[in-house]
Amino acid sequence: MTNYAIVKASGRQLWFEPGKYYNINYVHANPGDKIIFYKVLLLKNTNSLLIGKPFVEKVEVHATILQHLKDKKITVFKMQAKKGTKKKKGYKTVLTKIKINCIHNHKK
């Protein structure tokens, strides 16, 4: 059984496992910086399951920022029928690649 945590980060609920890499919405920090997620909604260890109300207390997820990157381009096309108006726009979402170092449970 693997350890994992469900964390509220960058406006979403994300499933984190130690030692894995994830792309999340942009975090204002430099590559190489360490970040800590405190808003843990659920923690699963080998022998226990902790569910928060709404967050699990004294649990934190430690991660390292590896790099900032852009996602694939999303194209938005607007058109008004019978008017001849067309607009084509596109954007690339800026993401941050992180590595989950460990999940600390200070409740033990």
Curated annotation (Swiss-Prot):
One of its GO terms (cellular component) is chloroplast. Keywords: Chloroplast, Plastid, Ribonucleoprotein, Ribosomal protein, RNA-binding, rRNA-binding. InterPro entries: bL21-like, bL21-like_sf, Ribosomal_bL21, Ribosomal_bL21_CS. One of its GO terms (molecular function) is structural constituent of ribosome. It is found in: Plastid, Chloroplast. GO terms for biological process: translation. Belongs to the bacterial ribosomal protein bL21 family. This protein binds to 23S rRNA. HAMAP family: Ribosomal_bL21. Part of the 50S ribosomal subunit. PANTHER family: 50S RIBOSOMAL PROTEIN L21, LARGE RIBOSOMAL SUBUNIT PROTEIN BL21C. This is Large ribosomal subunit protein bL21c. It comes from Cyanidium caldarium (Red alga). The gene is rpl21.
